[in-house]
């Protein structure tokens, strides 16, 4: 096969008016014989009606061969670099691809410079390719990966899921309902007026939970106002950063592993006490972040317990004064332990 390609190159070079190649100059007579045969065959094809041979060898059907072949005519269309929009066309149409059909890895020794340059090395093939930065997700998923995700989804038609799984929906609903109830209660305590606007989502259940929280939370604040004031002075809450630091103290309330509705309602009641303080120092914008911090601590650390107790429905059903007062005493002791009855709590939230 290599011999045929070599003879084709020699014949083309002589036909275009060039000198014989170095490796084939010694066998000029045999090469010349082959050249005459090739020429006769091409002429016969043109006479029969196939102008394709003339177009490939001479440049156009039925036309006389050109005296010389332009150097760029031996060049081929280089493959476009990876990531490029189109091919990097550097020469004439693909009819002059004398070596493309055989896919040789390197040009023959007799090949001249322009034709040899047309064969790309692996380094040239990757020219223009920019490696993707580590940790960056590709903008478009590969087709096979996208099909695999679609086929493994819950839909039978291969479409991607548009809604989260049921467990995730339940978690989101618990957080949403908790945030709505706690945020509404804290704002009402700060302004001193009830909000008549209906609650969204599970309205009836949330409304009952809010009414229960108003009744129980207001009683906790009245009975333990002095203790709440002492804790507020130690916390020294003045801005949103101080409010965010409060979440560490809330987590400590449940550090002994004991959870009950008494501790939860005491924590929310103290949050309402802090909301009143924020209103008095013109920091009402910090009330919503405070409600989010309380909700995050409760739902994130006590989700399993809340689900087992049926969430806010269980809160509405719960009302035992003994258990409530026992939970309140434990919360106050926990705050005192964090504060160290001194500057320990102030140091903790810095």
Curated annotation (Swiss-Prot):
List the ranges annotated as motif BH2: 304-319
The yes or no answer to whether the keyword Magnesium is present is no
Where do we find the motif BH1 here? 252-272
Span-the-membrane segments of this chain are 328-348
Chief location category: membrane
What the entry lists under Pfam families is as follows: Bcl-2
Annotated spans, PEST-like: 104-175
A GO BP annotation: mitochondrial fusion
Renumbered to this chain, region (Disordered) spans 148-170
User: What topology does the record note for this protein and the membrane?
Assistant: Single-pass membrane protein
Q: Fetch the PROSITE patterns from UniProt.
A: BCL2_FAMILY, BH1, BH2, BH3
User: Which InterPro entries would you find in this protein's record?
Assistant: Apop_reg_Mc1 (IPR013281), Bcl-2-like_sf (IPR036834), Bcl-2_BH1-3 (IPR046371), Bcl-2_fam (IPR026298), Bcl2-like (IPR002475), Bcl2_BH1_motif_CS (IPR020717), Bcl2_BH2_motif_CS (IPR020726), Bcl2_BH3_motif_CS (IPR020728)
Residues recorded as bearing Phosphothreonine in the entry: 163
Instruction: From the record heading this protein, give the residue positions of the covalent cross-link Glycyl lysine isopeptide (Lys-Gly) (interchain with G-Cter in ubiquitin).
Output: 5, 40, 136, 194, 197
* Family as reported in the entry's similarity comment: Belongs to the Bcl-2 family.
Q: How does it assemble?
A: Interacts with HIF3A (via C-terminus domain). Interacts with BOK, BIK, BAX, BAK1, and TPT1. Interacts with unphosphorylated BAD. Interacts with BMF, BBC3 and PMAIP1. Interacts with BOP. Interacts with BCL2L11; may sequester BCL2L11 to prevent its pro-apoptotic activity. Interacts with GIMAP5 and HSPA8/HSC70; the interaction between HSPA8 and MCL1 is impaired in the absence of GIMAP5.
Output this protein's name: Induced myeloid leukemia cell differentiation protein Mcl-1 homolog
Organism of origin is Felis catus (Cat)
